Amino acid sequence: MTMAISSALPSPLLLAASLLLLIVQAQGITRHYEFNVQMANATRLCNTKSMVTVNGQCPGPELVAREGDRVVIRVTNNVAHNISLHWHGVRQVRTGWADGPAYITQCPIQTGQSYVYNFTVAGQRGTLWWHAHISWLRATVYGALVILPKLGVPYPFPAPHKEVPVIFGEWWNADTEEVVNQAVQTGGGPNVSDAFTINGLPGPLYNCSAQDTFKLKVKPGKTYMLRLINAALNEELFFAVANHTLTVVEVDAVYVKPFTVDTLVISPGQTTNVLLTAKPYYPGANFYMSAAPYSTARPGTFGNTTVAGILEYENPAMSPSAASFVKGLPLFKPTLPQLNDTDFVTNFTDKLRSLATPEYPAAVPQSVDKRFFFTVGLGTLPCPANMTCQGPNNTQMAASMNNVSFVLPARALLQSHFTGLSSGVYAPDFPVAPLSPFNYTGTPPNNTNVKTGTKLLVLRYNTSVELVMQDTSILGIESHPLHLHGFNFFVIGQGFGNYDAVNDPAKFNLVDPVERNTVGVPAGGWVAIRFLADNPGVWFMHCHLEAHTTWGLRMAWLVLDGSHPNQKLLPPPSDLPKC
């Protein structure tokens, strides 16, 4: 009897192994990646150029981790440009040194040098992405960052048959560094891209690109999760798959209440996970997966073309060795909204709601310690002496928040703060509201000039913040996708016209607002967000339209250390790059 009982019990070794597995599942593992920044040749639109890449790829390598994992990426710079990489949407709690924006949290990695980005993905799961965060190098230096749920934790929706990253980008035949440098030197707008891309490929609607087409092969009746990422530099995009619906289940790595659409909109910096269920039968046709710009800007300042991939079905009647693409099949195209269809965009964004369940609560700050009001928009700077500028009335194009056009410092802000050597680097006096209020969405003022400076807004640790961002009509109303580093925030309200501080707060959603890291400030309108400043460090906030960021539509928050050890910024790593 004793022998029978003992043989039925697990051995001490098996118990120890099981316990270790449980600990690993709870705490995560460490995942190591090597990123070599190098030049590589690529041919698109019958044009070959040498461009900056990671590991010779564009898009770059897909990073995969699980919630709770530590991610260690060694980045070695083998190109003539300085480089820095940002892990877009990763909270970086107390690890701001790994956030990546050049001259904000680090000096860039110089030619021949390396830097190790070391961070833990805590309390996050879903689709994020990574990209270069200096000049316009993210045009070719970007990739997916997929955070899977912890082992044993299911999705809050039926598990898909397959998951597929779909990354939207832009292609310039020219060198993008020359494009931005020319714009800065002339004071005008940059030349628009020559094509949009899906996973680096322009697709059949562009000249010389039929062979450079992304194709997604599906099985009848199966459900696929598309991890959509807008890595385009300057364009918000509509996306649809002909004759198919898309069920939105996540944005910016946060689950949402599922809803089904024919078409969606996604801004630069944003991610959206959608479920696509293939037809239950072989349809005998192929279907375009198309994206085209949503723009409220003046004509000529954006690329108005369409990128397409192809959704094709496996034919059960064909052998697996048969050609994957059957020529001669009907090819259906989706109908996308008009390029300036703001009503469509508003209706789509209004559908976004957090799950707000016990498993995935919406921790919206119910009380507010600090309220801020930022104007967001374009403007001008005087043309330097002995120059002719291409901005309005011989000015330089500029952009600002609260009329401050942000100037990048020569020394990283986070390092300056941490060492206490901030004098001459930045001023902690970013205006909490416009210094000269005006009719923000009415007749533009005659004076379109902005001020310049490197100003930070200082917050005590754990401050609950409410921020209203107001678009302005200076040089024309325009949608601005604003990205906040270091935090997620809740989008509690939005509207058109001038924000009404008396009546609009009554309409705020404090129950299940969508939680994200990048939000569009509506053209000619406003958006209100709330977040808890529980992450010490210096955190960049900027428009994710790269042209606007270059013109100065950016600022930074400085969140001070809390009183407890786990509320303080960790010291910098020993290999932190020097300026």
From Swiss-Prot:
Pfam families documented for this protein: Cu-oxidase, Cu-oxidase_2, Cu-oxidase_3
Keywords: Apoplast, Copper, Glycoprotein, Lignin degradation, Metal-binding, Oxidoreductase, Repeat, Secreted, Signal
Main location: secreted
E.C. numbers: 1.10.3.2
BP-aspect Gene Ontology terms: lignin catabolic process
Signal peptide: 1-28
Binding site residues for Cu cation 1: 86, 483
NCBIfam families: laccase
Record protein name field: Laccase-4
Gene: LAC4
